[in-house]
Amino acid sequence: MKLTASDIHVELGGNEILKGIDAAIKEKEFVGIIGPNGSGKSTLLRQLKTSLQPVGQRSGRILYYGRDLEEVSQYTQSAKIGFVFQNPDTQIVTDKVWHELAFGLESIGMPQDMIRVRVAEMASYFGIQNWFYQSTDTLSGGQKQLLNLASVMVMHPKVLLLDEPVSQLDPIAAADFMATIHKLHAEFGITVIMAEHSLEEVAAYVDEVIFMKEGRLIAVRTHTRFVYFPA
């Protein structure tokens, strides 16, 4: 097990959002976290990267490759735990596509020659050479979300977290994005954890599904088993 959550409780603004979550995710798995609005799926996803944990009362423990996540440096978390947000505009911080690809590597102090190599590799892999020098504000929603994904993958993460990444895309862009995630998972062997409203969005790709309701884990489904956890 490479990511383990033990008895996670989170309280925000006096409301208990997560109520004793226990979960274990194996390396290289593709896991879907499914639940309606208010189920706690996005809050759970954010617990897996300390810089994104919302301010509030929290208890429990998360292990990342056997280490308490609180003890894993921000440098390591920035490089090895990638996150793609629901809103394509939320993540973009620069005005040019090429700079957006380079920004994360610059922030961790990578030498410029290595940055150029990595950026060129990812631009080619994602097929964005034709808009490499464009302004980010001229991109479509699908292009922005693809750029966000490429900007995460240029860091060579071990874990990729996605918070409803296709909910604001049109059906064609959403299908293309999901196909790209599937390709990344298959070719790079990264661990993928995606929060979504509907099982339909991820059913064709996932190894395991975690179902949530009202801050609790209510069931887990894999290809070979279904386990229900009564309240």
Q: Positions of the model-derived regions?
A:
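ABC ATPase NBD coupling module
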Residues: 68-82
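H-loop/switch region of ABC-family ATPase nucleotide-binding domains
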Residues: 196-197
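Conserved catalytic motifs of ABC-family nucleotide-binding domains
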Residues: 156
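Conserved ABC transporter NBD signature motif
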Residues: 57-68
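Conserved ABC ATPase signature
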Residues: 135-139
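Catalytic Walker B motif of ABC-type/P-loop ATPase nucleotide-binding domains
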Residues: 160-163
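Conserved ABC ATPase "signature" region
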Residues: 113-131
